[in-house]
């Protein structure tokens, strides 16, 4: 069993002002995405300026935050927010959903592309390899917060999370680190290696949807579901799996359509 590192979730406290590591991880994700995007900008569109890129990253970040919050409200704890709607604005108490954030990013990409002469999938193909930076940073934030841990296990790398998070004090899968490794590191490598060569429009977006969906679906088997939801079917199906399955299907469909529309790309890949 590995010891859980006792890291104060509050990175900096100045009087009543507290800056949490989880919030800083969002800044790391946004900053990292901007740096990588700036390196790939000339390949994407030589006419784009760094200012236009900054505008894109800003609106994508807004999509993540607003979409992530609304996604959590709608899919994970709707009854609580209906009973007390003001809770929606208490984002410092947690409650963000990737799938909602993903929808927010898609809406932001569509809106920004429409105003800047880019199609939806042109922008999504550019943005997709950036997303794992934010995903990985977010999972580190979850780990520091000692939240979203996994099921009890006796594997050698199991961890006992702090009593405030897990009163049962059981050795558990550090599922946040699994998601960091898969959704952050592995997905980053897959997408950025794949995107090095010219690909047909929609293919990179499809790869993101496919592999994120697979990774999330798999990790859900060892992650404890949200207490207010539990398992939704057959004693093992979680909300995360229900929301990830359409991503897997959509990813396969996008890749198939991309290469069907551009047979020369399929031959080049072979």
From Swiss-Prot:
It is an enzyme of class 2 (transferase). The gene is lgt. HAMAP family: Lgt. Pathway: Protein modification; lipoprotein biosynthesis (diacylglyceryl transfer). Catalyzes the transfer of the diacylglyceryl group from phosphatidylglycerol to the sulfhydryl group of the N-terminal cysteine of a prolipoprotein, the first step in the formation of mature lipoproteins. The chain crosses the membrane at residues 10-30, 56-76, 92-112, 120-140, 175-195, 202-222, 237-257. One of its GO terms (cellular component) is plasma membrane. One of its GO terms (biological process) is lipoprotein biosynthetic process. One of its GO terms (molecular function) is phosphatidylglycerol-prolipoprotein diacylglyceryl transferase activity. It is a multi-pass membrane protein. It is found in: Cell inner membrane. Belongs to the Lgt family. This is Phosphatidylglycerol--prolipoprotein diacylglyceryl transferase. InterPro entries: Lgt. Its EC number is 2.5.1.145. It holds the Pfam family LGT. Keywords: Cell inner membrane, Cell membrane, Membrane, Transferase, Transmembrane, Transmembrane helix. A 1,2-diacyl-sn-glycero-3-phospho-(1'-sn-glycerol) binds at residue 139.
